[in-house]
């Protein structure tokens, strides 16, 4: 009859115990213990004790990672012959001593390998751990990008300000143009009125000139009529030969009377002529003064019209230049917005790339943390197997309870630290702790 229990394995490594009982003699067997880290493995062969006859199997220890292997075996059998038993025990003790020396050497090698492995794990954690991540190489790129964004924003604001200033200047020029246009229209209306006044003045002047001509003709006619009357009077006097002697006082001389009448009429005609001439000159002076005033006003109006026309042309030129400036500024604004959008897209792509890289770094950190936990688990299991092997070599009894007690629970605490970096500074940090049994 035999009872066998075996195969209790953990993740990444395996170890098992089996106990076999025979009906004739009790036999205790410690089964093989497997443990490995990477390509390394440790195997402890079974050892059996019998009440009458004992046999101790071979024990072998091998390391695949170090490229070396050792193996030794012991076969001890007892019989009724005590001397034969003592000789076998002596030989077995020598073999055990040799195997113990080999085992201790293997333990030292394993400890050195564990030390190297821990050093590599520590270096990997220092290089790629969350607290040692160095993102300073991105600070220059981010500063340059921030500077470009700030410059683009400043240029955009400057362009908007220039456009607003140009729009305000265009509005001012439009108001000024409208006011100048109203002034021009009022001046043109005044010019039309002045032209009417000039036409009326010309008509009055022509009427006065016609009146003067009529008066001159009337004066000539009066002079001619007067001369004719004088000639007729003289002829009548010369032709009349009648001489009347009157016994009366001597009257006035007719020639003297005629001379007096002639002088009187000539004086009145001269007076009328002078008055007419003075009145004509006065009217002409008044008309000339009015005409000169109207001419000066007309010349001033023409000058003002020319000035207004020049100002209008200047304003139209400035308006065209402002329109062209506005068009160029709008084109520059569109180009700036397009360039700004392109830069923002490139920055977003860079940001997405950095975020993906950060995600990859975090996943690598998590993966290495899991690998570290796995290696730590393997190390602890190796230490447990070494302790069990030492206890077996020291001659301690091996029981099923001891094998089961070796299967102690190992709890692993995983601490995840999440940090948010802005401008190379930590703005938020969160810690998540998880415990699990190994």
UniProtKB/Swiss-Prot annotation:
Alphabetized GO MF terms: structural molecule activity
Taxonomic superkingdom: Eukaryota
Domain (IF rod): residue spans on this chain: 89-400
InterPro entries (UniProt xref): IF_conserved, IF_rod_dom, Keratin_I
Renumbered residue ranges of the record's region Disordered: 1-21
Xref: SUPFAM superfamilies: Intermediate filament protein, coiled coil region
Alphabetical list of Gene3D superfamilies matching this protein: 1.20.5.170, Single helix bin, Vasodilator-stimulated phosphoprotein
Keywords: Coiled coil, Intermediate filament, Keratin, Phosphoprotein
Region (Tail): 396-438
Disulphide bridges: none
Location of the region described as Coil 1A in the Swiss-Prot/TrEMBL record: 89-124
Changes after translation: Phosphorylated.
A Pfam family annotated for this UniProt entry: Filament
Positions of the UniProt region annotated as Coil 2: 258-395
PROSITE patterns: IF_ROD_1 (PS00226), IF_ROD_2 (PS51842)
Any single biological process term in GO: intermediate filament cytoskeleton organization
Region (Linker 1): 125-141
Region (Linker 12) location: 234-257
Note from the entry: There are two types of cytoskeletal and microfibrillar keratin: I (acidic; 40-55 kDa) and II (neutral to basic; 56-70 kDa).
Protein family (similarity comment): Belongs to the intermediate filament family.
UniProt-listed PANTHER family: INTERMEDIATE FILAMENT, KERATIN, TYPE I CYTOSKELETAL 18
Function: When phosphorylated, plays a role in filament reorganization.
UniProt subunit comment: Heterotetramer of two type I and two type II keratins. Keratin-18 associates with keratin-8.
Protein name in the entry: Keratin, type I cytoskeletal 18
